[in-house]
A protein has these predicted regions:
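Short amphipathic
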Residues: 168-171
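Short, low-complexity, Pro/Ser/Thr/Gly-rich segments in the mature regions of secreted, periplasmic
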Residues: 173-182
Length: 182
C-alpha cells in the first residue's frame, strides 16, 4: 500500500502524478522500447534507483527510465535525472510487454499487450516482460563457425547471426508482489 505522499507517474500528461508505477513507449517501426518504473521511497538507504544510487528521504518517488541509445541500454534515475548512464552494452533490441488480468478468481487469465495498446490501463499492470537482445563483436575468436539463422530475436522472428554471437534474455517481473504470473 502506498502512502499519501506517493503520487506516482503522470499517466495522462496533465503534470500531476496519477499513482502509476509503470509506463512504457513502443519504439517506432519495431525499434527499441522505453520503460519507466516508479516506486515509493520509504527509506533513503534501501530505495536505490536504476543506477544503484540512494535517494534523498525527502524524495517520495523513485523513478527509473530505461531506453536504448547507441547500442547501449541506458538508465535515467531519480538520483541524477539529467545524466543517463549505460547499464548494458552491445544491445540490438529492447522490447517490453505488459500483463493485465482478465476476469477474476480461478477463471482469471492474463493478456499481454504492447505499450501502444495500454491506453488508460497503466494502473492495472500486473507484470512486465522484458527482452534484451545482445550481440558479440564481429569476427570474435573461438567457438564453432556460425552458419544459417541462429537465433530467434525479441521480435519472435528467426534472424541471421551475421557472423556474431547473439543472446536473447527474456524475463517476467511481477509488480506489487502479486505472486506468480504465467
Amino acid at each position: 500500500m502506498y502512502s499519501p505522499h506517493f503520487d506516482g507517474l503522470d499517466l495522462d500528461g496533465d503534470g500531476v502524478g496519477d499513482g502509476g508505477h509503470v509506463w512504457g513507449l513502443d519504439g517506432p517501426q519495431g525499434s527499441a522500447d522505453t520503460l519507466v518504473l516508479s516506486f515509493e521511497n520509504r527509506s533513503a538507504s534501501i530505495s536505490p534507483d536504476c543506477l544503484g544510487a540512494g535517494t534523498a528521504k525527502t524524495l517520495h518517488r523513485v523513478d527509473s527510465r530505461f531506453f536504448v541509445s547507441g547500442g547501449r541500454l541506458m538508465c535515467r534515475g531519480s538520483s541524477n535525472a539529467a545524466t543517463p548512464q549505460p547499464v548494458a552494452e552491445s544491445l540490438e533490441d529492447f522490447q517490453v510487454r505488459y500483463a493485465l488480468r482478465l476476469g477474476s478468481g480461478d477463471l482469471a487469465t492474463l493478456q499481454w499487450l504492447d505499450a501502444d495498446q495500454m491506453a488508460g490501463q497503466w494502473p492495472q499492470v500486473l507484470a512486465v516482460q522484458v527482452c534484451l537482445q545482445m550481440v558479440g563483436v564481429v569476427g570474435a575468436v573461438g567457438g564453432p563457425r556460425l552458419e544459417g539463422p541462429s537465433f530467434q530475436g525479441c521480435n519472435g522472428l528467426d534472424q541471421a547471426h551475421e557472423g556474431r554471437r547473439h543472446i536473447v534474455l527474456r524475463n517476467t517481473f511481477v509488480l506489487r508482489g502479486l505472486g506468480r504470473v504465467r
